[in-house]
Amino acid sequence: MSNNNFKDDFEKNRQSIDPKEHQENTQDSVNDSVDNIKEEVSDKSDEQFPPRNAQRRQRRRDTATNQREDEQSNQEHHNENNEVGDRDNGLQHEDNSSRDSNADKESNDPSQNNNLIHESSNNQQSENRHDINNEKDQSDKDSNNKKGAVIASSGAAGVGAYAASKHNDAASSSKDHNDKAHQQNQDWEQSNQTNDSTETQDENTNNHDSKKKGAAVAGGAAAAGAGAYAAGKHKGKKDKNDNEPEQNESKSDVKNEEKHGSKKKGAAVAGGAAAAGTGAAAASHSKSSTGNGGNGNGGNGGNGNNGDNNHDSEDNNKKKGGLLGKLLPIIAAILILAAIGIFGGMALTGNNDDKGSDDDKKVADNKDKDSDKAKDADSDKDSKSDKDKDKAKDDDNNQATTDSDSSDSSDNANSDSDQGNNDSQDQANSDQNQGTQDEQNSQNNQDQQSDQSQQNGQANSNQNGSSDQSQNASNDSNQQNNQSSNSNSGQRTHVVNGQNLYRIAIQYYGEGTPENVEKIREANNIQGNDIHNGQRLVIPQ
């Protein structure tokens, strides 16, 4: 950091690009296929300087932070290996760690990276090989990460088989690195160096592989065919790597491409899976994990720094692979739970909507029933009011008829009394006149002859006969009046007030039958229903 304070902006910006950072940036924007990603990485691996402007400054910051973290992690891991190793070789391990730290500082220092004069040809070759191996391993890991994300998002069916095949591939790749490290350690043994660090490294690898195996077994469900296919495929790949050692970097590149193809096949087969092949995948992975101590590929001779760099990159890759192996089942479980929660919520809300619609229908039906009841009540009230009006009219008509009957009876009584009074007065007058005439005749005709008396007697008899006749006539008239009054009292009358014969018959007879209507017609000489308001009708008994 102190050296950067004395550099100008141009020298500060002349920093090399970390290939891992390149790999992550390019894979975020490219999603077509793994082959295209590898081609772009290989094309951009030769670039030494970032583009200018804002992207350059941002990449410079990210690169500086990533280099600092890598340096710390490599230093810590190397210190652990130094503590585990034998105390007899402690000085040599310290020398190796110092050389590794010097190599890391030289690679991290931008001035040292750009000043190619101070680097030896062996260091250049080892660092170039280290960068290429890191690029390919990182590309394989990122492609596997993308495949894992796609399969995990599609459901829990292919998670287990993919995790098993992925960790088998990680185990086979780590086995290749371990074989290289073992070969280099054998070269160091020829130069009076022990392989205690290699044995501890193998133990760490076995422990780490067992952890990954547990994560793969806990990862959930996969198909039986997919697990068996992945097991056979990677077992054959392990045997091939054990029996056919590779001698140069071109063959290792071909091996990585084939390995990547096998990963694609394993992921594709595991995509349509169910929950039966977890055991087979775990068994195949356990076989591949126990085979780490076999005959490894013979790498280039190189120097000690190359072996240490490969060793550090292996450990970093193993750590990242272990984290991914633990995270994949967790992500798949979260996705499954989220899908179950979504469908459950949809089902519950659907049921609630149905219940709400049923409640609305019930409320609407109740409202309709209430409205019908209200209408019925209104109609009942109207009918009652009509009946009350009819009763009031009938009562008025009955009262009118009773009034008319009473008036008729009073008129008849008055007429009878008047006639009786007249008759009595006439009879009294006639008797008085007769008496006076008799007295006059007796007084005036006392001296007349008997003839006159006879004539007077005849006249008196005639007068008496006429008076008797008048009295009989008056008696007959009285009898007729009595009969008429009796007939009037036996028959009823009705004054028409906006009614028809049917209503009148119902009022007086209780039934509107045609016989009752015909009685009223005959009594009043009516043809049809020809009546008018105010007409007085006789209602027979």
From Swiss-Prot:
LysM domain span: 491-539
Disulfide-bonded cysteines: none
Top-rank taxon, per record: Bacteria
UniProt cross-references to InterPro entries, sorted A to Z: LysM_dom, LysM_dom_sf
Protein's UniProt keywords contain Membrane: yes
GO CC annotation terms, alphabetical: plasma membrane
Regions of compositional bias (Low complexity) in chain numbering: 146-165, 215-231, 267-290, 398-491
Comp. bias (Gly residues): 291-305
Positions of transmembrane segments: 327-347
Keywords: Cell membrane, Membrane, Transmembrane, Transmembrane helix
Polar residues bias (residue ranges): 109-126, 183-198
Protein name: Probable elastin-binding protein EbpS
Species annotation: Staphylococcus saprophyticus subsp. saprophyticus (strain ATCC 15305 / DSM 20229 / NCIMB 8711 / NCTC 7292 / S-41)
Gene: ebpS
